[in-house]
Amino acid sequence: MLSRATRLLSTKNVVVNSIVKHTTIRSFASHGGGEAGGAYPTEPEAGTQMITRRVEFGDAVYSYKHGNFIVDPIQIRELAEEQQQQQHHVHGPGCSHGHHHDSHANDGHHDEHHDEHHDHVNPDDVEDEFPRGYFLNTPPSVPYPMNPYYLTALCLLPIIGSLFSIRYFDNKSENDYELFRSEYLEANPALKQKYYDITHKYPLSH
């Protein structure tokens, strides 16, 4: 939300000092700077007329409570509309707004050229979003994106499950083998006697 609001309040020739209680807008003439494709300077040149206005927004655009931003869509809409009007009308004489439409303001196609080259803000495009990453985004009641203990247990679950599965299937295989051997020896008495002699009467100790 902070970055979105900052983008709404930032232009090439507008310096925003604060967006919480008020905004101080400074603008100065940039004679041909935007027209020539150059960047607007951060400090005015000598002899440049400076215009300073203090814009009061009343209550804060957003409030900070319990580690979360509270977004008011109505205030965002009003701010976007007001700021769009300010950034097109509050400027020093000769300020070019990033292009050269002021240099031919008396031309017949001035309004058309102005609308074509300006990036107008649509308040409907302002989204309500929380200042957290998309992948770990959580509701505002959660103080942290993810509990580290919960994350550790979540990672250990597959390992613990694999160990239990191996133990279970090993025991099952051993029991199945013992059952098969006993049934096979009972069905073959001669083989059962020979097996007994080998394992008990003549143990394989050598």
Curated annotation (Swiss-Prot):
Q: Where in the cell is it found?
A: Membrane
Membrane-spanning intervals of the chain: 150-166
Got a GO cellular component term for this one?
membrane
Q: How does it sit in the membrane?
A: Single-pass membrane protein
Region called Disordered, residue ranges: 81-132
Regions of compositional bias (Low complexity) in chain numbering: 82-96
Q: Where is the composition biased (Basic and acidic residues)?
A: 103-123
Q: Which domain of life is it from?
A: Eukaryota
The entry's keywords: Membrane, Transmembrane, Transmembrane helix
Q: Supply the name of the protein.
A: Uncharacterized transmembrane protein DDB_G0283731
Taxonomic source organism: Dictyostelium discoideum (Social amoeba)
